[in-house]
Amino acid sequence: LGVSEDADYDEYEEEDDDEDLPQDESDSPPDVPGTLALGYLACAPLLAAYEWSLATSAEPTRSTAEVCLFRFLLPLGEDAHLARQGILLALLIVCLLRLARHSRGLGLRLMKVLGEGALWALLLAPTLMLCTHLLGGVEPPAGFSVEPGAAPGLARAAFILGAAAHEELFFRVILYSGLYLTARVLMVHFGAGLTCARLVGEAVGLVGSAGVFAALHLAAFTTWLGSGGEEFEPFVFLWRLLAGIALGGLLRWRGPGVAAWTHALFNLGLLLGAGPEMGF
């Protein structure tokens, strides 16, 4: 997958026994399936929180990313949610089996993913504000920042956490990878060198997935999914575009688990009134 090729995820990889290691470890390729498996396992609590929020809410709201991910289940009607849960559970089992032979220290690696996500969540808001200030030309709308208010309901907080995980799976893992691979294959087909093709693929995947991420928060682009979405506001759109680029970079560098927990904890902070009013 394009999201993890050439990335250094060795910090989250468990060393094999000596006889399983290649003679030259520096030449060994990154363990893409292992990285994705660890990332999905780290996302499991977030996805479970999302399912719980849907089950306990009187009028459940669904994430746009989740609707897009599982739109192919619509013909199943009322059984679609059971099929979705079955797919998520099956993926979890596959990931557990993939990581079984490297299970020693797995809990520590998962805690490192969560801790790193919390750290990046703290750094993300000031980084986005600095970038929007440096770019200039747009001003935050009135009421963009709020003071901490009453604590949200538990179901709402669970939804916010789980929706972030679905957005990382859809916009970063799937869409980023798809755009990257498509652009890379096309560049090679038209005679570009492999290095050039990779760079173009990275740019197309990173910016393209971030642009779609920002656009699918707007009513103009979500009418085909049903009600919901916001009116276009330049600052908020730029904010989300930059957020998508930052999260895509995190995914590429640190893996999907870190990106998902960064996104989830950042949005939870916004919900609690810790920063800008508009979540992304």
Segments (PLM) and residue ranges:
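Juxtamembrane helix-loop-helix connectors linking adjacent transmembrane helices
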Residues: 69, 73, 101-166, 180-196
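Interfacial helix-start motif at the membrane-water boundary
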Residues: 70-90
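Central hydrophobic cores of alpha-helical transmembrane segments in multi-pass inner-membrane proteins
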Residues: 88-101
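Alpha-helical transmembrane segments
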Residues: 36-50, 119-121, 206-212
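Membrane-interfacial, low-structure loops and terminal tails that flank and connect transmembrane helices
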Residues: 8-33, 108, 187-199
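Alpha-helical transmembrane segments and their helix-start/interface "positive-inside/aromatic belt" motifs
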Residues: 27-43, 105-119, 257-260
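Alpha-helical transmembrane segments of multi-pass membrane proteins
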Residues: 42-63, 128-133
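Transmembrane helix-loop-helix hairpins at the membrane interface
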Residues: 154-280
